[in-house]
């Protein structure tokens, strides 16, 4: 594959494997080496913490004054009911909040399909169990659903609402993110003759309110918008006095210990008086293999660590070592 060494490969959406109704695997490739983890970790954090969604935030149950109680004729205690309500997968169209009502009587399970709501609300998991009634008992409740982002504990809202909140209105920890679980894996990828590329595989489980491909698109948009400020730095007027460009990349002036090699590899380099990264990159593979006790495994480790920093063996450095290091060598 021909091209400038400064050109980066751009990933493309390769495959979406729908494992089940709420889980999918999204594969993106090719990525430059190291970018699998860079992008995978950034997208994972955004998908978990920053995706907008809807969640239950408040509940009022007839005959219940606080969450540390129980209701006659209901198998579950109030805390269990609140926990089950957190599992509702809901979407709201055209507004930021909605009030749902639930009234049920007679023995049996109370499910999400028993909830009454207007046309702007969709309950994605209607079979979700909220509680169980025994005998000829009933239960009535009002459920507030709001649109938000991230995770907002009930205690955070309680501090600002305690004075105005009526007795019996129970606050619920709100997890607005539609992504329930996210994990990523980086595998090897190949493009023509290049075999040192990354393939990013994102394994995502949602609550069913968002399509996995749309979730990836939204998270990437959020990341791009946050990085726009850094892109605009190029348009800032440069100062009249430009700093003198250093003769060598600062990373070359750092000690070999900063590479965090294994003890065996580090000791072999020290035995050859290789103290700085600039000393190391000028050596060739053949020269290093002649080093006592340094085998192919150690050589591979050294090459991988250098590659992760954009360096390689066999580089030519004019005027090395610099005067600042000459006295130490």
UniProtKB/Swiss-Prot annotation:
GO terms for molecular function: DNA binding; DNA-directed RNA polymerase activity; protein dimerization activity. Its EC number is 2.7.7.6. Residues 248-329 are annotated as: Alpha C-terminal domain (alpha-CTD). The keyword Transcription applies. Gene3D superfamilies: 5' to 3' exonuclease, C-terminal subdomain, DNA-directed RNA polymerase, insert domain, RNA polymerase, RBP11-like subunit. The keyword Transcription applies. GO terms for cellular component: cytoplasm; DNA-directed RNA polymerase complex. SMART domains: RPOLD. It catalyses: RNA(n) + a ribonucleoside 5'-triphosphate = RNA(n+1) + diphosphate. InterPro entries: DNA-dir_RNA_pol_insert (IPR011262), DNA-dir_RNA_pol_RpoA/D/Rpb3 (IPR011263), DNA-dir_RpoA (IPR011773), RBP11-like (IPR036603), RNAP_asu_C (IPR011260), RNApol_insert_sf (IPR036643). Keywords: DNA-directed RNA polymerase, Nucleotidyltransferase, Transcription, Transferase. It is an enzyme of class 2 (transferase). GO terms for biological process: DNA-templated transcription. Residues 1-234 are annotated as: Alpha N-terminal domain (alpha-NTD). DNA-dependent RNA polymerase catalyzes the transcription of DNA into RNA using the four ribonucleoside triphosphates as substrates. The N-terminal domain is essential for RNAP assembly and basal transcription, whereas the C-terminal domain is involved in interaction with transcriptional regulators and with upstream promoter elements. NCBIfam families: PRK05182.1-2 (NF003513), PRK05182.2-5 (NF003519), rpoA (TIGR02027). Belongs to the RNA polymerase alpha chain family. Homodimer. The RNAP catalytic core consists of 2 alpha, 1 beta, 1 beta' and 1 omega subunit. When a sigma factor is associated with the core the holoenzyme is formed, which can initiate transcription. This is DNA-directed RNA polymerase subunit alpha. It comes from Shewanella sp. (strain W3-18-1). The gene is rpoA.
